[in-house]
Every structure is written in structure tokens, then in C-alpha cells.
Amino acid sequence: MTSPARPLSILHVVRQFLPNRGGLEDVVANLAREQARLGHRVRVVTLDRLFSKPEVRLPARERLEGIDIERIPFSGSHRYPLAPSVFRHLGDADLVHVHAVDFFFDALAWARPFHRRPMVATTHGGFFHTNAHSRLKALWFSGPTRVSVRAYEGIVACSESDARMFAPITPAGVTVIPNGVDLDKFAGAASAAPRRALLTIGRFSHNKRLDRLLSAMRALGPGWRLRIVGVPSDVTVAALAAEIDRLGLTDAVTLHVGLDVPAVRELIGQSSLFVSASEYEGFGLALIEALSAGLVPVAHPNDAFAWLKERHPLISLCDFADPASAAGAIRDAYARLAEGRLDPGAASLPGAEDLSEYRWPRVAARYVALYEAALAGTGAGTGLRPSTSR
């Protein structure tokens, strides 16, 4: 891919970022790095405290992993953090890219007539990750969110299920760009010999349904191991440890918090299957990483995982609400692997799936094309000041 004729000044706005680790943070970090590699000037504005460590205030400005980060204070709930000083950080941005649907999404949209910056947004699943406050969320989605989307030149969904959710409130249409994935990070790291060892990676949050995963582990019985890798969110390490102890799984299940990439890769090397009981995913980044590692995935059939299953037949889906059924699916996936009963076709062997569409150069190119269209649509791409009309 060649560098752009006119480098852009791109501002990413996201509520949580490095040094925090998670799917959203990884997506923004990788996209920012790839755009910088292409010659663009890239900044990230984020909140100055991690939700997992609210007592620690991070530096106002920092450069991490080659990315310029500006952090701002906030108040209110983690679900809708209020951070009005974001407007002081727009600077010379040619385009603002908002990630997720929260205060930033609404505030920058409603203030569009004043800041007049072209904007695109990636939904990352919106705010429907759990059923909590579902009626209020539905009302907000059909009201303020419906109004806010009109301020954006482009709305991007990470999956077809996400696109279906936002299409009814987005008159200009929704563009589907699957998240990019660092396919080299864990490439081929899975155990060469089949093991009754399971791995799950992700935030410790209610929508991940780690409680159901633990119930499936108890149903599996002796001889199985589960490694839970991630960072605390709305489920604490103490709560998880207590549940593991209550179920009598302390010898079978271990928690691994805040690991770096080499440490996670080492755990993958001791595992054969990836498992997820998640009820909701905006995309399913960890599952794609698992496929790249050569792990065999067994996952709950949420919309995002069902969409990925259509593309990647190695994935097994089962209802983790039924521990016995989930345990049976895990045993069957392991047996197919151990006995060599996996389809020998190239698309159905661990590590052999075609994942090229998720490579970051391809994904970044699609986003830059969207940016150029957004700038052209506002007149900014021709050096004119952006119009406030749509």
C-alpha cells in the first residue's frame, strides 16, 4: 500500500485506551499505528483514569507504543462518563474518529455546528452488551442516538449484526468493516499436542458470562483445565476467585490478570481449545486471535459469533446456558482434534483458516478510503471549510 498524497491529521476519541488492555483498546491502537505508518498524523484522546484503577490518574500527555495520547478528566458513571474538555483537544484535526456510543459520540455530534469537524464513528457494539437497563437503553437508542448519528459522515459497524442494529436509525446507511486483528501476535502458538486445556481471553465483565463458563467446567469433571486471561471490568478478581472456590474448581481453573503478549502466548502454548460463553460481542476479536493461534474455538451463539461461524467452519457453537450441553460440545471438539477427525479441508484445520481480511493494512486502507469520502463530502478534502449541513 502506498502512502497518501495528502497526509491527514486524524484524531481518535475513545473512553479507554493504553495502558489498559481489551478489544476496544487494541483495535484503536492498531488502527492508529497503521495509519501513522502510512504517513498520517494521528492522536488519541481518552479519559485520564482507567475504569479498573479509578484511583490512579494517568499523565495528561504520553507517547506509548508510538502513539501520541492526550488524556482528559471525567465525572459521572463509567457507562456514560462526562468529559466536556474533549472540545479543547480537537486542534488541527482534519477528521475526528469516535469509537463506541457514549458521551463522546453524543457530545461531538450535538456540538457539530460549532466545531465543524468531519466525523466518522465505529459503533463497537453500541451499548447493548448486557440486558441491564434494557428499556432505558432502547429509549436512548431510538431518541438521542438516532439524532446523533446524523452528525457523522460515516457510521461503521464491526459486524453484520451490529450493522442490522444501527441501520434503522442511520438514514445514510452503515458501512461494515470487520475489526482488524494482529494475526502475527499469537500465530501458531497453540499446543502442538492435543491437551484437555481451555483458554478464554477478555474483560472480566457480566456480558462475558464467566459464571456459565465455570459451570461448564464443573460439568466437564476431572482432567480438564481452564485458564481465564483478562482484566477486571464490572466483575472483580475477588468475585471470580470466590466463585471458583465455591464450585470447587481451584485446582482446575486459574486467573491470569493483566498479562503482556509474551505471557499470553505462553499460556496459549499450553492450551488446545478457546472457549467463550459471552452473551454479547460487538465483533469477536479474541476468537479471531484464537483461530490465528491454532486453537479450536467453542463459543456461545451470540450474533457476532454466529456471523463468524458462517465464515470460519472450525468454530463450534453451543448454548452455555446449559452446562451439560456446553461440556458435551467441548468434549466433542477435543475428541475431533485428538482423534484427527477434523475435516482435512484447508478451512477446517487449526491454524489453516483464511484470516487475511482481518489484516490491519487491509482494514486501515478501508478506513482511510472512508475518511477521504467524508472529507470530500464536507468540502474539507478540497481545502474548503466543512459545512454544517448534511
Predicted stretch roles:
Residues D68, A238-L259:
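Nucleotide-activated donor-binding/catalytic signature segment of Leloir-type glycosyltransferases, i.e.
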Residues A138-G154:
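Membrane-proximal helix-turn-helix segments that form the acceptor-binding/catalytic region
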Residues R311, I315-A324, D332-A338:
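Conserved acidic donor-binding segment of nucleotide-sugar-dependent glycosyltransferases
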Residues D48-F51, I201, R225-A241:
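Glycosyltransferase donor-sugar binding loop
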Residues G258-L259, E266-S271:
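Short alpha-helical donor nucleotide-sugar binding micro-motif in glycosyltransferases
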Residues S161, G180:
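Carbohydrate-associated surface elements
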Residues L11, A190-R218, R227:
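Conserved donor-binding/catalytic core segment of Leloir-type glycosyltransferases
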Residues E279:
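Aromatic "clamp/platform" in nucleotide-sugar-dependent glycosyltransferases that forms part
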